[in-house]
Amino acid sequence: MAVQAYRSLKKYETFSYLPQMTPEQVRRQIAHAIAQGWNPAVEHTEKGTPAKASYWYMWKLPLFGEQSVDAVVAEIEACHREFPDQMVRFVAYDNYAQSQGMAFVVYR
């Protein structure tokens, strides 16, 4: 697996150091989050702002109890269609730890 140059692009999350995920890899990550019992959500923000200083806007409400990967991917695609010039990320909330279990940018 190829790794991108360290300082070539802005880093928004852990997977930023790897090449862009394929749609199948995104689906597998979402399936893993659902299998953990985490609640999926979709967020978006403007491009060009530093990741730590930017505010991520929630797309609708979290998909509480959603078990379908297709439904989550459909929401990600709908958000991207609505905001084609913005970054879109997937977030999985862990009810037990009361924190994010996973988050990664799907569209940079």
UniProtKB/Swiss-Prot annotation:
Gene3D superfamilies: Ribulose bisphosphate carboxylase, small subunit. GO terms for biological process: reductive pentose-phosphate cycle. It holds the Pfam family RuBisCO_small. Keywords: Calvin cycle, Carbon dioxide fixation. It comes from the Bacteria. SUPFAM superfamilies: RuBisCO, small subunit (SSF55239). The keyword Ribonucleoprotein does not apply. One of its GO terms (molecular function) is ribulose-bisphosphate carboxylase activity. InterPro entries: RuBisCO_ssu, RuBisCO_ssu_dom, RuBisCO_ssu_sf. The keyword Oxidoreductase does not apply. Belongs to the RuBisCO small chain family. RuBisCO catalyzes two reactions: the carboxylation of D-ribulose 1,5-bisphosphate, the primary event in carbon dioxide fixation, as well as the oxidative fragmentation of the pentose substrate. Both reactions occur simultaneously and in competition at the same active site. Although the small subunit is not catalytic it is essential for maximal activity. Heterohexadecamer of 8 large and 8 small subunits. The basic functional RuBisCO is composed of a large chain homodimer in a 'head-to-tail' conformation. In form I RuBisCO this homodimer is arranged in a barrel-like tetramer with the small subunits forming a tetrameric 'cap' on each end of the 'barrel'. This is Ribulose bisphosphate carboxylase small subunit.
